[in-house]
Protein backbone atom coordinates (compact mmCIF):
# COMPACT_ATOMS: atom_id res chain seq x y z
CA UNK A 1 0.00 0.00 0.00
CA UNK A 2 1.36 3.43 -0.93
CA UNK A 3 2.25 5.41 2.22
CA UNK A 4 3.09 8.60 0.29
CA UNK A 5 0.38 11.25 0.91
CA UNK A 6 -1.71 12.10 -2.13
CA UNK A 7 -1.84 15.60 -3.58
CA UNK A 8 -5.29 16.12 -2.02
CA UNK A 9 -4.01 15.11 1.41
CA UNK A 10 -1.04 17.48 1.06
CA UNK A 11 -3.38 20.32 0.13
CA UNK A 12 -5.56 19.56 3.15
CA UNK A 13 -2.52 19.56 5.43
CA UNK A 14 -1.30 22.86 3.96
CA UNK A 15 -4.74 24.41 4.37
CA UNK A 16 -4.98 23.21 7.97
CA UNK A 17 -1.52 24.63 8.71
CA UNK A 18 -2.44 28.01 7.19
CA UNK A 19 -5.66 28.17 9.20
CA UNK A 20 -3.79 27.37 12.40
CA UNK A 21 -1.17 29.98 11.50
CA UNK A 22 -3.81 32.67 10.97
CA UNK A 23 -5.55 31.71 14.22
CA UNK A 24 -2.30 31.83 16.18
CA UNK A 25 -1.18 35.18 14.77
CA UNK A 26 -4.66 36.64 15.33
CA UNK A 27 -4.60 35.46 18.94
CA UNK A 28 -1.20 37.08 19.53
CA UNK A 29 -2.47 40.36 18.05
CA UNK A 30 -5.57 40.23 20.27
CA UNK A 31 -3.42 39.41 23.30
CA UNK A 32 -1.18 42.38 22.51
CA UNK A 33 -4.28 44.58 22.26
CA UNK A 34 -5.54 43.35 25.63
CA UNK A 35 -2.12 44.12 27.14
CA UNK A 36 -2.19 47.65 25.69
CA UNK A 37 -5.72 48.20 27.03
CA UNK A 38 -4.64 46.95 30.46
CA UNK A 39 -1.69 49.37 30.39
CA UNK A 40 -4.07 52.28 29.74
CA UNK A 41 -6.40 51.14 32.55
CA UNK A 42 -3.42 50.81 34.90
CA UNK A 43 -2.31 54.33 34.02
CA UNK A 44 -5.71 55.63 35.13
CA UNK A 45 -5.91 53.57 38.32
CA UNK A 46 -5.05 55.58 41.41
CA UNK A 47 -6.28 58.26 43.76
CA UNK A 48 -5.15 61.03 41.39
CA UNK A 49 -7.82 60.80 38.65
CA UNK A 50 -6.75 62.23 35.30
CA UNK A 51 -8.08 62.09 31.70
CA UNK A 52 -6.35 59.42 29.64
CA UNK A 53 -5.07 62.00 27.15
CA UNK A 54 -3.22 63.87 29.87
CA UNK A 55 -1.81 60.59 31.19
CA UNK A 56 -0.41 59.70 27.76
CA UNK A 57 1.17 63.16 27.58
CA UNK A 58 2.55 62.56 31.07
CA UNK A 59 4.45 59.49 29.84
CA UNK A 60 6.61 61.81 27.73
CA UNK A 61 6.60 64.63 30.29
CA UNK A 62 4.48 66.79 27.99
CA UNK A 63 1.45 67.40 30.22
CA UNK A 64 0.74 71.01 31.18
CA UNK A 65 0.20 69.82 34.76
CA UNK A 66 3.63 69.11 36.28
CA UNK A 67 2.04 66.93 38.96
CA UNK A 68 0.69 64.57 36.28
CA UNK A 69 4.17 64.19 34.76
CA UNK A 70 5.60 63.31 38.18
CA UNK A 71 2.83 60.84 39.09
CA UNK A 72 3.01 59.04 35.73
CA UNK A 73 6.79 58.95 35.28
CA UNK A 74 7.81 58.23 38.88
CA UNK A 75 4.92 56.12 40.14
CA UNK A 76 2.54 54.53 37.68
CA UNK A 77 4.78 53.90 34.67
CA UNK A 78 7.60 52.13 36.60
CA UNK A 79 4.95 49.91 38.20
CA UNK A 80 3.49 49.01 34.80
CA UNK A 81 6.91 48.29 33.27
CA UNK A 82 7.80 46.16 36.31
CA UNK A 83 4.61 44.11 35.87
CA UNK A 84 5.28 43.62 32.14
CA UNK A 85 8.90 42.53 32.68
CA UNK A 86 8.16 40.30 35.68
CA UNK A 87 5.01 38.75 34.21
CA UNK A 88 6.54 38.23 30.78
CA UNK A 89 9.69 36.72 32.27
CA UNK A 90 7.79 34.35 34.55
CA UNK A 91 5.41 33.33 31.75
CA UNK A 92 8.31 32.51 29.43
CA UNK A 93 10.23 30.72 32.19
CA UNK A 94 7.20 28.51 32.82
CA UNK A 95 6.86 27.77 29.10
CA UNK A 96 10.51 26.71 28.80
CA UNK A 97 10.52 24.64 32.00
CA UNK A 98 7.46 22.77 30.72
CA UNK A 99 9.27 22.14 27.41
CA UNK A 100 12.66 20.95 28.69
CA UNK A 101 11.16 18.80 31.47
CA UNK A 102 8.24 17.73 29.24
CA UNK A 103 5.97 18.39 32.20
CA UNK A 104 2.80 20.48 31.75
CA UNK A 105 2.70 21.32 35.46
CA UNK A 106 6.23 22.74 35.63
CA UNK A 107 6.81 26.38 36.54
CA UNK A 108 9.17 28.30 38.78
CA UNK A 109 6.58 28.35 41.59
CA UNK A 110 5.32 24.74 41.40
CA UNK A 111 8.87 23.34 41.24
CA UNK A 112 10.12 25.44 44.18
CA UNK A 113 12.51 27.57 42.12
CA UNK A 114 10.91 30.84 43.25
CA UNK A 115 10.82 29.64 46.86
CA UNK A 116 14.52 28.80 46.62
CA UNK A 117 15.19 32.31 45.33
CA UNK A 118 13.15 33.78 48.19
CA UNK A 119 15.18 31.79 50.71
CA UNK A 120 18.41 33.00 49.10
CA UNK A 121 17.25 36.62 49.35
CA UNK A 122 16.20 36.14 52.99
CA UNK A 123 19.55 34.53 53.81
CA UNK A 124 21.38 37.47 52.23
CA UNK A 125 19.34 40.05 54.16
CA UNK A 126 19.36 38.46 57.64
CA UNK A 127 22.42 36.21 57.84
CA UNK A 128 24.80 38.17 55.60
CA UNK A 129 23.35 41.56 56.51
CA UNK A 130 23.07 42.75 52.91
CA UNK A 131 20.76 45.54 51.80
CA UNK A 132 19.45 47.19 48.66
CA UNK A 133 22.63 49.28 48.42
CA UNK A 134 24.91 46.23 48.31
CA UNK A 135 24.74 45.82 44.55
CA UNK A 136 24.35 42.26 43.28
CA UNK A 137 24.56 40.57 46.69
CA UNK A 138 20.85 39.83 47.17
CA UNK A 139 20.15 38.89 43.51
CA UNK A 140 23.19 36.59 43.51
CA UNK A 141 22.06 34.78 46.66
CA UNK A 142 18.55 34.50 45.20
CA UNK A 143 20.03 32.98 42.03
CA UNK A 144 22.08 30.45 44.03
CA UNK A 145 18.95 29.42 45.93
CA UNK A 146 16.97 28.95 42.73
CA UNK A 147 19.75 27.09 40.90
CA UNK A 148 20.11 24.67 43.82
CA UNK A 149 16.44 23.74 43.44
CA UNK A 150 16.78 23.47 39.66
CA UNK A 151 19.71 21.05 39.97
CA UNK A 152 17.68 18.81 42.28
CA UNK A 153 14.70 18.86 39.88
CA UNK A 154 16.96 18.22 36.88
CA UNK A 155 18.63 15.31 38.68
CA UNK A 156 15.28 13.74 39.55
CA UNK A 157 13.98 14.19 36.01
CA UNK A 158 17.02 13.02 34.04
CA UNK A 159 18.89 10.58 36.26
CA UNK A 160 16.21 9.08 38.50
CA UNK A 161 13.56 9.02 35.74
CA UNK A 162 10.87 10.35 38.08
CA UNK A 163 7.44 10.80 36.46
CA UNK A 164 6.04 14.28 35.73
CA UNK A 165 3.62 13.93 38.65
CA UNK A 166 6.51 12.87 40.88
CA UNK A 167 8.48 15.95 39.82
CA UNK A 168 5.59 18.19 40.86
CA UNK A 169 5.29 16.40 44.21
CA UNK A 170 9.04 16.81 44.69
CA UNK A 171 8.61 20.50 43.87
CA UNK A 172 5.89 20.80 46.52
CA UNK A 173 8.18 19.16 49.08
CA UNK A 174 11.10 21.41 48.14
CA UNK A 175 8.84 24.47 48.29
CA UNK A 176 7.74 23.49 51.80
CA UNK A 177 11.34 23.03 52.92
CA UNK A 178 12.49 26.41 51.63
CA UNK A 179 9.35 28.14 52.91
CA UNK A 180 10.01 26.68 56.36
CA UNK A 181 13.66 27.74 56.21
CA UNK A 182 12.61 31.27 55.20
CA UNK A 183 10.18 31.38 58.14
CA UNK A 184 12.97 30.39 60.54
CA UNK A 185 15.15 33.16 59.16
CA UNK A 186 12.28 35.62 59.68
CA UNK A 187 12.02 34.49 63.31
CA UNK A 188 15.58 35.65 64.01
CA UNK A 189 15.33 38.88 62.00
CA UNK A 190 15.16 42.32 63.61
CA UNK A 191 12.32 44.76 62.90
CA UNK A 192 13.96 46.38 59.88
CA UNK A 193 14.96 43.05 58.34
CA UNK A 194 11.52 41.58 59.07
CA UNK A 195 9.72 44.41 57.29
CA UNK A 196 12.01 43.84 54.29
CA UNK A 197 11.32 40.10 54.29
CA UNK A 198 7.56 40.64 54.42
CA UNK A 199 7.99 42.41 51.07
CA UNK A 200 9.53 39.26 49.56
CA UNK A 201 6.72 36.99 50.74
CA UNK A 202 3.84 39.34 49.84
CA UNK A 203 5.13 40.56 46.48
CA UNK A 204 5.08 44.25 45.60
CA UNK A 205 5.27 45.91 42.19
CA UNK A 206 5.38 49.43 43.58
CA UNK A 207 8.79 49.42 45.25
CA UNK A 208 10.88 49.41 42.07
CA UNK A 209 12.12 52.54 40.34
CA UNK A 210 13.71 53.10 36.96
CA UNK A 211 17.16 52.43 38.42
CA UNK A 212 16.04 48.92 39.48
CA UNK A 213 14.57 47.85 36.15
CA UNK A 214 17.72 47.77 34.03
CA UNK A 215 19.02 44.44 35.33
CA UNK A 216 15.63 42.74 35.09
CA UNK A 217 15.12 44.07 31.55
CA UNK A 218 18.52 42.70 30.44
CA UNK A 219 17.91 39.22 31.92
CA UNK A 220 14.39 38.96 30.47
CA UNK A 221 15.69 40.14 27.07
CA UNK A 222 18.45 37.50 27.10
CA UNK A 223 15.95 34.77 28.01
CA UNK A 224 13.54 35.90 25.27
CA UNK A 225 16.29 36.05 22.63
CA UNK A 226 17.76 32.64 23.50
CA UNK A 227 14.40 30.87 23.71
CA UNK A 228 13.03 32.30 20.48
CA UNK A 229 16.28 31.42 18.68
CA UNK A 230 15.77 27.79 19.81
CA UNK A 231 12.01 27.65 19.21
CA UNK A 232 12.33 24.84 16.65
CA UNK A 233 14.55 22.85 19.03
CA UNK A 234 11.80 22.98 21.67
CA UNK A 235 9.30 21.80 19.04
CA UNK A 236 11.56 18.84 18.23
CA UNK A 237 11.90 18.05 21.93
CA UNK A 238 8.13 17.52 22.10
CA UNK A 239 8.59 14.36 20.01
CA UNK A 240 11.00 12.90 22.55
CA UNK A 241 14.64 13.18 23.49
CA UNK A 242 15.75 10.50 21.02
CA UNK A 243 14.04 12.25 18.11
CA UNK A 244 15.63 15.58 19.04
CA UNK A 245 19.09 13.99 19.27
CA UNK A 246 18.61 12.33 15.87
CA UNK A 247 17.94 15.80 14.42
CA UNK A 248 21.32 17.01 15.69
CA UNK A 249 20.07 18.89 18.76
CA UNK A 250 22.28 18.93 21.84
CA UNK A 251 19.49 18.12 24.29
CA UNK A 252 21.65 18.25 27.43
CA UNK A 253 22.93 21.73 26.61
CA UNK A 254 19.47 22.92 25.56
CA UNK A 255 17.99 21.70 28.85
CA UNK A 256 20.78 22.99 31.08
CA UNK A 257 21.05 26.45 29.49
CA UNK A 258 17.27 26.80 29.44
CA UNK A 259 16.94 25.92 33.13
CA UNK A 260 19.82 28.20 34.16
CA UNK A 261 18.29 31.14 32.29
CA UNK A 262 14.86 30.40 33.78
CA UNK A 263 16.38 30.32 37.27
CA UNK A 264 18.24 33.56 36.59
CA UNK A 265 15.02 35.19 35.41
CA UNK A 266 13.05 33.91 38.42
CA UNK A 267 15.71 35.07 40.87
CA UNK A 268 15.93 38.58 39.42
CA UNK A 269 12.12 38.85 39.53
CA UNK A 270 12.08 37.72 43.17
CA UNK A 271 14.89 40.16 43.98
CA UNK A 272 12.87 43.06 42.58
CA UNK A 273 9.21 42.28 43.30
CA UNK A 274 9.18 39.33 45.72
CA UNK A 275 7.44 35.96 45.40
CA UNK A 276 4.89 35.86 42.54
CA UNK A 277 3.20 32.48 42.16
CA UNK A 278 1.41 30.67 39.33
CA UNK A 279 1.96 33.21 36.52
CA UNK A 280 4.49 30.83 34.95
CA UNK A 281 1.96 27.98 35.14
CA UNK A 282 -1.22 29.76 34.08
CA UNK A 283 0.01 31.91 31.16
CA UNK A 284 1.52 29.11 28.98
CA UNK A 285 -1.56 26.91 29.48
CA UNK A 286 -3.99 29.64 28.46
CA UNK A 287 -1.94 30.34 25.32
CA UNK A 288 -1.47 26.63 24.59
CA UNK A 289 -5.25 26.10 24.53
CA UNK A 290 -5.41 28.40 21.49
CA UNK A 291 -2.12 28.07 19.59
CA UNK A 292 -1.18 24.50 20.54
CA UNK A 293 2.37 23.35 21.31
CA UNK A 294 4.12 25.23 18.49
CA UNK A 295 6.78 27.29 20.28
CA UNK A 296 6.93 29.73 17.37
CA UNK A 297 3.69 31.14 18.80
CA UNK A 298 3.77 29.68 22.31
CA UNK A 299 6.90 31.61 23.33
CA UNK A 300 5.68 35.13 22.41
CA UNK A 301 2.20 34.19 23.62
CA UNK A 302 3.54 33.17 27.04
CA UNK A 303 5.41 36.47 27.31
CA UNK A 304 2.33 38.52 26.40
CA UNK A 305 0.05 36.33 28.51
CA UNK A 306 2.26 36.49 31.59
CA UNK A 307 2.60 40.27 31.32
CA UNK A 308 -1.15 40.72 30.84
CA UNK A 309 -2.09 38.42 33.73
CA UNK A 310 0.27 40.08 36.20
CA UNK A 311 -0.82 43.56 35.10
CA UNK A 312 -4.50 42.55 35.44
CA UNK A 313 -3.76 41.10 38.88
CA UNK A 314 -2.07 44.32 39.92
CA UNK A 315 -4.97 46.37 38.56
CA UNK A 316 -7.36 44.24 40.61
CA UNK A 317 -5.17 44.59 43.71
CA UNK A 318 -5.13 48.39 43.38
CA UNK A 319 -8.82 48.95 42.66
CA UNK A 320 -10.89 46.30 44.47
CA UNK A 321 -10.80 48.12 47.84
CA UNK A 322 -9.11 51.37 46.80
CA UNK A 323 -7.14 53.18 48.18
CA UNK A 324 -5.81 50.03 49.91
CA UNK A 325 -3.39 48.09 47.66
CA UNK A 326 -3.55 44.33 48.18
CA UNK A 327 -0.33 42.25 47.92
CA UNK A 328 0.05 41.01 44.36
CA UNK A 329 1.56 37.69 45.48
CA UNK A 330 -1.62 36.87 47.40
CA UNK A 331 -3.79 37.78 44.40
CA UNK A 332 -1.88 35.57 41.94
CA UNK A 333 -1.84 32.66 44.41
CA UNK A 334 -5.57 33.00 45.08
CA UNK A 335 -6.41 33.02 41.37
CA UNK A 336 -3.76 30.55 40.21
CA UNK A 337 -4.24 27.89 42.88
CA UNK A 338 -7.62 26.61 41.60
CA UNK A 339 -6.27 26.34 38.04
CA UNK A 340 -3.26 24.38 39.29
CA UNK A 341 -5.61 21.90 41.01
CA UNK A 342 -7.69 21.64 37.83
CA UNK A 343 -4.63 20.87 35.71
CA UNK A 344 -3.34 18.37 38.26
CA UNK A 345 -6.60 16.41 38.47
CA UNK A 346 -7.17 16.68 34.73
CA UNK A 347 -3.78 15.07 34.10
CA UNK A 348 -4.46 12.35 36.65
CA UNK A 349 -7.85 11.59 35.09
CA UNK A 350 -6.29 11.10 31.65
CA UNK A 351 -3.85 8.55 33.07
Q: Which residues make up each language-model segment?
A:
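Alpha-helical transmembrane segments in inner-membrane proteins
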Residues: 1-351
